[in-house]
Structures are given as structure tokens and as C-alpha cells.
Regions:
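PP2C/PPM-type serine/threonine phosphatase catalytic domain
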Residues: 1-243
């Protein structure tokens, strides 16, 4: 598995509140996460970067020779602990009040691959023929869409399109979507913030992912496509491609 990441401030925002992290110990033990902070420059940047730092610490502390009984439980407990830390910081420090962050990413331990998701960053599985979103956006507009109250076309222009219904650090407990991923040999993983998926719809994104480029050129190409389509938000993406 080859892992590469890229972040860009975009063309509109004054600061970049996105943060990414990845650690690869070996082919069977790795992690990768994207966090999109919110709550003003200082709060949003702090929430996303601190979350990534704490994920790094938790993953580095794992011993591959002592397999976890349940990776999903470890992910849930780790994110709950980080959530409580960010939440307490926001209560105690006035300049960080109201901060929070999305969290979307994957953890592979001894060849078992799991994902965790909070917010509206996304995880996709892709190959030459298909792009599949495996996460559900935790947004007000997506809840309307899932309940049949608006159409997909209406959701694209809805004034509350960016309102989150779930984020890390905004309350004592956080809901986390967790699941196992069983990749086929031809399948790869994309993790990205909404600054990418709002600029490139499914067809454009799939086309960009299948450009005949080496991984370093491909990630630059995708980022540039998002900038050319508006670049109205910070853009962050991680590609995990099987060799």
C-alpha cells in the first residue's frame, strides 16, 4: 500500500484549518486520517491538528505483536477520548470556544482494515471502473435528502448545505460511524475534506483518479482540478493505492 497526502489553502480562505496525518509501519499496519476544523481560525486549526496528533500517539502506542481483540472498539474509544479532550479545551479556553472538527480515516492492524467517520469529510473506495462513497455525510441537508424531504438537485444548492449534525469536540459524547473494509486487489482508498468533494462531483473525481499518472502526479492533478473548479475551501486528500 502506497500512501500520499496533499493539502492546499484554496483560493478563498485566509487560513487552512484542514489537517491530515498518516503513519505506515509496514504493509499490514498503517493509518490515515483527514480532519477539517471549524470554529474560527485558531479553534478550527487547533481542533484538527490536535486530533491528528492524538491519533498519531494512540496508533504509535499499539504493539503489532499484541493484536487488539476489536479494532472497531479501539477506534471508538480513541475518538471518544480525543473528543472529550477537545470539548474540555473549548470550555476552558475562551479563544477556543465552539471549536470542533470532522474526522475521517482508516486504520489497518495486522492486515485488518477499518474506517472511522465523523462529519462531512469522506472516504471513497475506487478502482478503474467505479467510485464508491462508503461514509455518510453528517449534515443537515443530507438528513433531509435521506428522509426524502428534498431532491439531490435541491441539496446541491441548499443554503444550509454546510451545516454539520455531528462533529468531534462539540459535546461530551460523539457519534462515530465505524466499519470494516475488505479491499479487493484492484481497489484503492481516497480520504478527503469537503473542499475537494464539493468542487469535484463523482464523475469528475472518478475520471481524475483514473488518470494514467504516478501517484505523486495524480494527487497534484486532483488538487489542481479542485482549484480550477473554484477552490472555495481548504482542499485536503489522502490516496492509498495498492501496489
Amino acid at each position: 500500500m502506497k500512501i500520499i497526502a496533499k493539502t492546499d489553502i484554496g483560493l478563498v480562505r485566509a487560513t487552512n484549518e484542514d489537517t491530515y496525518t498518516f503513519i505506515k509501519k509496514d504493509e499490514k499496519n498503517f493509518m490515515a486520517f483527514v480532519c477539517d476544523g471549524m470554529g474560527g481560525h485558531l479553534g478550527g486549526s487547533y481542533a484538527s491538528s490536535k486530533t491528528c496528533d492524538m491519533l498519531n500517539e494512540a496508533f504509535e502506542a499499539l504493539d503489532p505483536t499484541k493484536p487488539l481483540k476489536n479494532i472497531g472498539v479501539w477506534l471508538f474509544e480513541t475518538l471518544q477520548n480525543i473528543n472529550m479532550f477537545i470539548y474540555q479545551e473549548s470550555l476552558e479556553k475562551e479563544n477556543l470556544r465552539g471549536m470542533g472538527t470532522t474526522v475521517s480515516g482508516v486504520v489497518c492492524l495486522n492486515g485488518e482494515l477499518y474506517y472511522a467517520h465523523i462529519g462531512d469529510s469522506r472516504i471513497y473506495i475506487y478502482n478503474e471502473y467505479e467510485l464508491q462513497q462508503i461514509t455518510v455525510d453528517h449534515t443537515y441537508v443530507n438528513s433531509l435528502l435521506l428522509n426524502g424531504l428534498i431532491t439531490y438537485k435541491q441539496s446541491l444548492k441548499h443554503p444550509k448545505k454546510h451545516v454539520l449534525t455531528n462533529a468531534l469536540g462539540i459535546k461530551k459524547n460523539v457519534s462515530v460511524d465505524i466499519g470494516q473494509i475488505k479491499l479487493k486487489e484492484t481497489e484503492n482508498v481516497l480520504i478527503c475534506s469537503d473542499g475537494l468533494h464539493n468542487m469535484l462531483d463523482g464523475k469528475k473525481l472518478q475520471k481524475a483518479l483514473n488518470e494514467p499518472l504516478v501517484l505523486e502526479e495524480k494527487i497534484e492533478f486532483i488538487k489542481d482540478k479542485a482549484l480550477k473548479n473554484g477552490g472555495v475551501d481548504n482542499i485536503t486528500l489522502i490516496l492509498l493505492e495498492q501496489k
